Amino acid sequence: MSEPLARRVPIRVLTFVAVLGVLWGIWELWHWIGTRFKLTWPFTVNDVTMPHLHRIVQALFQPAQANGPSLLHVLLNASLFTAKEAALGFALGAVGGFAIAVVLSQSRFLERGIIPYVVASQTIPLLAIAPMVVVGLGSKGIHDWLAVSVLAAYLTFFPVTINALRGLQSADPRAVELMRSYAASRWSILWKLQAPTSLPYLFSAFRIAAPLAIVGAIISEPSASIQGGLGGAIVNFNQYYSIEPQDLWATNVISALLGIGFFLIVVLAERLLVRRAPENVA
């Protein structure tokens, strides 16, 4: 580990812990104020709507059901299942989004004609198309969890397409003309110039798409009647929210941590693969 990195890591860890501590304090302060003064705006504050954070942490180490494994054990297994679906969905969305961007980058006519439909695809609620995808793929004998991956890909391909297209079009026009003057083919220009130039833009999209893959998988699991993932756990604990709200909150925390984990993997991959990023990358 280099010396600058060795200095940055402890600072970032301390910053994360400090921010977490501040948020914890704000939560508990608002809980105390809300219960003490019986606040009803923006919502009624009580132990159901805002359970103490220490109760949420304690719930992770208590049995999820009588004589069963701990809630943390159950949620970790559910996280692995959802992570499998989301990882495949992310890969499908990334490959599909980049492929669409490559096609559109070769023709302004195609770009102007297809981009509006790409944008319009994101206005359709995932819950509306999830049953159609699950039933349609199920009729072909495809496993339900693969249908969930397809739905996760549906959420992830859009940012990849838009950013990849921007990256492919950001190649220096002078470099493109120089390669053409040496009779370079479109394929050579694409893979030797445009694709490397688009990497920073791609990873900007991947940082957005990775957590979206988790969201897509979790939302789609109930439509596929999958009980083994985080989506199934959320639906299950939602039925007992008025009695044990901390279980649902704990599930939400684990879901958020899984999304953060996917994001950090992308950040690590970016640091390993992208050496220099253009300053104007969003």
Label the predicted regions.
Residues 1-34:
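N-terminal signal-anchor/first transmembrane alpha helix
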Residues 34-91:
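Periplasmic/extracellular loop-to-transmembrane helix junction in inner-membrane transport proteins
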Residues 48-61, 224-239:
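Short hydrophobic, aromatic-rich alpha-helical segments embedded in or entering the lipid bilayer
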Residues 88-118:
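Transmembrane-helix boundary motif in ABC transporter permease subunits
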Residues 115, 119-159, 166-167:
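Generic hydrophobic transmembrane alpha-helix motif, especially the helices
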Residues 163-202:
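Short cytoplasmic-facing helical segments at TM-TM junctions of multi-pass membrane proteins
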Residues 249-282:
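C-terminal transmembrane helix and the adjacent membrane-cytosol boundary/short C-terminal tail
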